[in-house]
Amino acid sequence: MKYELQKTDGRARRGRLVFERGVVETPAFMPVGTYGTVKGMTPEEVKETGAQILLGNTFHLWLRPGQEIMKLHGDLHDFMQWHGPILTDSGGFQVFSLGAMRKIKEEGVHFKNPINGDSVFLSPEKSMEIQYDLGSDIVMIFDECTPYPADWDYAKRSMEMSLRWAARSRQRFDELNNKNALFGIIQGGVYEDLRDVSVKGLVDIGFDGYAVGGLAVGEPKEDMHRILEHVCPQIPEDKPRYLMGVGKPEDLVEGVRRGIDMFDCVMPTRNARNGHLFVTDGVVKIRNAKHKDDTATLDEHCDCYTCRHYSRAYLHHLDRCNEILGARLNTIHNLRYYQRLMAGLRQAIEEGKLEHFVEDFYGRIGKPVPPLNV
């Protein structure tokens, strides 16, 4: 993987990630394919929305169908028939989400398999081996996602263990002679001094890119913005920056303003299945009765398959009838909305007009522009 920084506008960056499997224009949004599928979508449909890279979930794919089934097909690309780049998370966040079902120790995490109750162990080394078998174009180190709220002492211990796990991840990745990219994950909760230690430790180890983890876990938006403003300038300029698990359209805009290059989130797909659709002027809740006889298209500014063919009334009808097609059409639209948003941000950075874009974006959805303290 090679990262090329092409243009900046303030802290915002316009670049590209070059892989053997294709080019990813940044800032980029990665649809989430947890189980080897973006829910309800064929790979061709996902590509048509403008997506150039997907996210796969190491934890879930390891538990089901497992490494051996994957290797029978070649790797995850062959298994799911997506031949563009794939980033896989390490499983750290999913283990963190298990709560009482897991025990975190220095060697790794012991937990109960949520599918069948078996005792399972996941370590930095095992995560690197699984992601190697998946053929991930971007491998994420195994870390502990520091919860929110966490006091300074807990966040410090968690961050320090994540640094030790980062070094172990790096070592096992190199032992496997993996030629793909390995990203470090910056932890430290909402504490700037801990984030400083994490960034320096990871840069000293050396990675192909750096993710900001432990945000979008319940902290106030002001804290997310503050941490990004503090951390991003410390990340080497020639390496991509990835904000994990984010987020709402406004979060993507604010991340880009602060120097983030990559995002992922289940929001566009999950919300689509619940009739919550993103449009240029905000949100349409297609389940609401007012759309029953609305012959208008979902978003007159959108060029997706759904908006080119169907009315709000039809989408409302499908949702009320629990038709699978409704969830699919909604997903196509939401994914395209996110990709159009990213394309707009990229163009604005190229033209040196990012803040004009930001003002227009917030004006359309009727919200004030958050302050930028950089």
UniProtKB/Swiss-Prot annotation:
Listed GO MF terms: metal ion binding; tRNA-guanosine(34) queuine transglycosylase activity
E.C. numbers: 2.4.2.29
GO biological process: queuosine biosynthetic process; tRNA wobble guanine modification; tRNA-guanine transglycosylation
Family: Belongs to the queuine tRNA-ribosyltransferase family.
Pathway given in the UniProt record: tRNA modification; tRNA-queuosine biosynthesis
NCBIfam families assigned to the protein according to its UniProt record, in alphabetical order: Q_tRNA_tgt, tgt_general
Free-text function comment from the UniProt entry: Catalyzes the base-exchange of a guanine (G) residue with the queuine precursor 7-aminomethyl-7-deazaguanine (PreQ1) at position 34 (anticodon wobble position) in tRNAs with GU(N) anticodons (tRNA-Asp, -Asn, -His and -Tyr). Catalysis occurs through a double-displacement mechanism. The nucleophile active site attacks the C1' of nucleotide 34 to detach the guanine base from the RNA, forming a covalent enzyme-RNA intermediate. The proton acceptor active site deprotonates the incoming PreQ1, allowing a nucleophilic attack on the C1' of the ribose to form the product.
Keywords from the named record: Glycosyltransferase, Metal-binding, Queuosine biosynthesis, Transferase, tRNA processing, Zinc
InterPro entries: ArchSynthase1/Queuine_TRR, TGT, TGT-like_sf, tRNA_ribo_trans-like
Cofactor detail note: Binds 1 zinc ion per subunit.
Originating species: Yersinia pestis
Active site, UniProt feature: 89 (proton acceptor), 264 (nucleophile)
Cellular component terms per the entry's GO annotation: cytoplasm; cytosol
Stretches for region RNA binding: 245-251, 269-273
The protein, known as: Queuine tRNA-ribosyltransferase
Keyword Thylakoid (UniProt): no
Pfam families named in the record: TGT
Entry cofactors: Zn(2+)
Keyword Signal assigned: no
Annotated residues for binding of Zn(2+): 302, 304, 307, 333
Superkingdom, natural source: Bacteria
